[in-house]
Amino acid sequence: MSRVRISLIYLCTFMIITSTKTIEYTACNNTIIIPCTIDNPTKYIRWKLDNHDILTYNKTSKTTILSKWHTSARLHSLSDSDVSLIIEYKDILPGTYTCEDNTGIKSTVKLVQRHTNWFNDYQTMLMFIFTGITLFLLFLEITYTSISVVFSTNLGILQVFGCVIAMIELCGAFLFYPSMFTLRHIIGLLMMTLPSIFLIITKVFSFWLLCKLSCAVHLIIYYQLAGYILTVLGLGLSLKECVDGTLLLSGLGTIMVSEHFSLLFLVCFPSTQRDYY
C-alpha cells in the first residue's frame, strides 16, 4: 500500500500546470517569442494553439514536425530548459498557446493582438495641420481673386472647383481620424492627399484671371508639383501598418509652403491689368 502511495505522489509532482501568461503583439512585430521554460528532462516538446498542434520536437531523434499553417515556427533554443517558440507575424494567430512535454508539464500563454495607430500621434497631428493650413490658404487665394476681378464663367469655375476640393479633403479628414489602419482610414487618407493635384489647376486659374502668369509663377507651380510627387510616393510607402510617414509629411509640407508663396505673389505683386468692380 505504501508503494502505491509513493508512486501516486511521484506522478503528481510532474502534473504541473503553470499560471497562464498574457502577451500582446501588434503588426509592428516581425516575429513573436512565446516564452516557455521546462526544467525537467523530456523526450519531446509539443506546442499547441488551442487544440491544434503547431510544432513537435523529438529530443531523442532531434526531429521537428511543423504544422502546414505555421511553417515559420521554431524553438528559440534547444537547451533542456528554454523551449520558447519563435513564430513570424504572417503565421501568428491570437489564442491560447500551450507548450508541454511527455511528463505532463504545461505552460500556457495567451496571445492577444493589440491594434495600433497607423501613424504616431505627432505625424497625425502634422498631417491635419498641413492640410488645414493648405485649405485655408486656398480659401484666401480664391477670395482674393474673386474680389479682384469682375465675375465671369472662369471665376465661377474656380470657385466651384475650390469648394469641391475643400469638401473632399474635409470628408477625408473625418474618415481618417483617428489614424487606424482600416479600409475607412485608407480611403480617408487618399481623400486628404490625392486632390492636392487640383490645387495646381486652381493656382493656374487664379494667376491667369489676374494676368500674372510669369516665370516666378511657373517656379511656384513646379515646386508644388514636386510636393505632390513626394506626397504620392510617401502615400505609396505608407499603405501598411507601422510605417514612418516622414516622406508623406514632406510632400504635404511642400504643398503648404507653395500655397504660401502663391498667396504672397498674388497680394504683393498686383497686376496692372486687373478689372475692379
Swiss-Prot record:
Keywords: Glycoprotein, Host membrane, Membrane, Transmembrane, Transmembrane helix. One of its GO terms (biological process) is positive regulation of phagocytosis. It is found in: Host membrane. GO terms for molecular function: thrombospondin receptor activity. It is a multi-pass membrane protein. Belongs to the orthopoxvirus OPG166 protein family. This is Protein OPG166. It comes from Vaccinia virus (strain Western Reserve).
